[in-house]
Amino acid sequence: MQTIFVMAKCALGQAYEVADAAIQEVEQVSEVHSVSGQYDLMMKCYLSDEADIGHFVTESVQTLPGIADTFTIIAFKAFS
């Protein structure tokens, strides 16, 4: 299982709609948080080991209405 975080900039006034769409339409998105800073949202996504991260981001996340820009972070290890 691969864990990635996708930071998203949204069109003005669209962050809540983008968050709702990400949770409802993209199966791999497990959490969406509104954040401060350069980006509006942070999405936590779980992908299969075989999944291509680039294709997932460009085809499933960047195509959501209201997404203006993304930045992807790949997690190496989760600590508990």
Which residues are covered by each model-predicted region?
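A compositional/biophysical signature of low hydrophobicity enriched in polar/charged and small residues
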Residues: 1-80
